[in-house]
Amino acid sequence: MSDKPASMYRTIDKPSYTRREYITGIPGSKIAQHNMGDLSAEPDDYPVQISLRVEEELQIRHGSLESSRLSANRHLIKELGEGNYKMTLRKFPHQVIRENKQATGAGADRVSDGMRQAFGKPVGTAARLNKDDIVFTAYCDVEQASVVKEAFRRAYNKLSPPCRITVDRGEELLVS
């Protein structure tokens, strides 16, 4: 069965699940890794820090986070090589998403319970983000900043909210 559209889970209209230990059957996260590039490097080893920020409050599903991470990281590896940057995914999908499955087709009214006991079963996880939260951060050299910005542009094409790319450190080096 395919996923429901992301618009069903985008808004934060319900309180979060606070006790995950009581929930059974939570699907595993699709996010393979949070740190990419040169894992042994410290952030201070690079003069430029660039971030991808969201511009509104919402939830992003784990599959969307993983696909944006993959597209950005693949572009950086192809253009810069594995050891010339450091990128971090800053959010983790803690929020459990539920879905009340509905039977469809002939005779579904006899099988389905409709809205009786409609709490729903866990179908995935999502990350809750506030306005101006940072999703990705990349550390690079001055010459590589344009490549990182292009990678983040590819990443936010996979995300549903409007995003912006900000230079958090080293902006004076990029201008001169």
From Swiss-Prot:
CDD domains: Ribosomal_L16_L10e. Transmembrane segments: none annotated. It comes from the Archaea. GO terms for molecular function: structural constituent of ribosome. HAMAP family: Ribosomal_uL16_arch. Belongs to the universal ribosomal protein uL16 family. This is Large ribosomal subunit protein uL16. It comes from Halorubrum lacusprofundi (strain ATCC 49239 / DSM 5036 / JCM 8891 / ACAM 34). The gene is rpl10e.
